[in-house]
Curated annotation (Swiss-Prot):
Residues annotated for Zn(2+) binding in this entry: H79, H237, D241
Protein family (similarity comment): Belongs to the LpxC family.
Biological processes per GO annotation: lipid A biosynthetic process
SUPFAM superfamilies xrefs: Ribosomal protein S5 domain 2-like
Domain of life: Bacteria
Function: Catalyzes the hydrolysis of UDP-3-O-myristoyl-N-acetylglucosamine to form UDP-3-O-myristoylglucosamine and acetate, the committed step in lipid A biosynthesis.
Protein name: UDP-3-O-acyl-N-acetylglucosamine deacetylase
Gene Ontology CC annotations of this record: membrane
HAMAP family documented for this protein: LpxC (MF_00388)
Active site per the UniProt annotation: H264 (proton donor)
Length: 286
C-alpha cells in the first residue's frame, strides 16, 4: 500500500443554503477533526452522536445519497463528499442544522470554495492508499459498473439518454485529482429531464429545486441559469456523484472505474464490492 499524511481543515467554515429536495434552509459547518476521525456528520455541534461517512450507513439512494445511524439522518451528501475526497481531506466534522445538505448552485463549487476558505492542514499520522488487486463488477439491467486495478484513480463514464436527444450519448474519462476535480468536475450542476418534474414532485422531491441550482433538459433545448458550463455537463456531473458515492468506501483507493448509466444505487453497490475486495486483499496480506 501507498501512504500519505492524513489531512484536515485548518479552520472552521460555514455556509447557509437550501436543500434541493426538501426545500429547507440549513446552516452547514465544517470543522477540523483529529487524526483517524474520518468524515463524520452530525445535526448539532453540541451532540456527540455522529454518522460516519461509510457505506454501512447508507439508507437511501433515491435521487441522492442518504446516511443514517441511530435515528439521525442526513441526505444529499454526495457533492460535499466528492469535494472532500478529491481534495484529500480525511478528517472533518460536518454539522448541518437540517436533514439535507444545502445544494448551492447544484454543483460542488460551493464546497470547493469552503475547503479553499478553510485551508488544508497535514497531520502527523498517515493514511494508507489501497490499490485494487483484481477487477470487480456490478450490473443491473442496462447499468454496468466495473473497477479495474490501476496506479491512479480514474473514472470513465458513458451516459446514454435515448429518450432525450438534447443529452443523447456522452462520454468522459478523467484521472481524478484535486486539479482535475477543480477544473473539470466541480462546476458541473445537477440536472433533470423536464418530463420528470411531475413525477419528482409527487415523490416529495425537488422542493428546493429551481433554475438556480439545477439544469432542466427538454427534448428541444435546455432550461438553465446561463449557458451550460460544458457541452457534456451532464456526464461530468455523473462523475461528480460517482466520486462522492465511492468515497463512502472509507479509505482512499486506486482503481480505474468504468460506468455505463449508473446512479446512486448502483454506485453504492459497486462501492460495496470494492470494499469487500480491499478487505479480502488486506486479510491475505495478514
Amino acid at each position: 500500500m501507498l501512504g500519505r499524511a492524513q489531512r484536515t481543515l485548518k479552520r472552521k467554515v460555514c455556509y447557509s443554503g437550501v436543500g434541493v429536495h426538501f426545500g429547507k434552509a440549513a446552516m452547514l459547518t465544517l470543522e477540523p477533526a483529529e487524526e483517524n476521525t474520518g468524515v463524520v456528520f452530525s445535526r448539532h455541534a453540541a451532540s456527540e452522536q455522529y454518522i460516519p461517512a461509510r457505506l454501512a450507513n447508507v439508507c437511501g439512494t433515491g435521487r441522492s445519497t442518504t446516511l443514517s445511524l441511530d435515528g439521525s439522518v442526513i441526505s444529499t451528501v454526495e457533492h460535499l463528499l466528492a469535494s472532500l475526497y478529491s481534495f484529500g481531506v480525511d478528517n472533518v466534522r460536518i454539522y448541518c442544522s437540517e436533514d439535507e445538505i444545502p445544494i448551492g448552485d447544484g454543483s460542488a463549487q460551493v464546497f470547493m470554495d469552503l475547503i479553499d476558505q478553510a485551508g488544508i492542514q497535514e497531520q502527523e499520522q498517515t493514511v494508507q492508499i489501497a490499490r485494487l488487486a483484481h477487477p470487480v463488477y456490478y450490473q443491473y439491467q442496462d447499468t454496468i459498473l466495473a473497477a479495474f486495478p490501476s496506479d491512479e484513480f480514474k473514472i470513465s463514464y458513458t451516459l446514454h439518454y435515448s429518450h432525450n436527444s438534447t443529452i443523447g450519448t456522452q462520454y468522459r474519462s478523467l484521472v481524478i485529482s484535486e486539479e482535475s476535480f477543480r477544473k473539470e468536475i466541480a462546476p458541473c450542476r445537477t440536472f433533470a429531464l423536464y418530463s420528470e418534474l411531475c413525477f419528482l414532485m409527487e415523490k416529495g422531491l425537488i422542493g428546493g429545486g429551481c433554475v438556480g441550482n439545477a439544469v432542466l433538459f427538454k427534448d428541444d433545448g435546455v432550461i438553465s441559469l446561463g449557458k451550460l458550463r460544458f457541452p457534456d455537463e451532464p456526464v461530468r456531473h455523473k462523475i461528480l456523484d460517482l466520486i462522492g458515492d465511492l468515497s463512502l468506501v472509507g479509505t482512499p483507493f486506486l482503481a480505474h472505474v468504468i460506468a455505463v448509466g449508473s446512479g446512486h444505487s448502483s454506485n453504492i453497490a459497486l462501492g460495496n464490492r470494492i470494499l469487500e475486495a480491499l478487505q479480502h486483499e488486506q486479510e491475505l496480506v495478514k
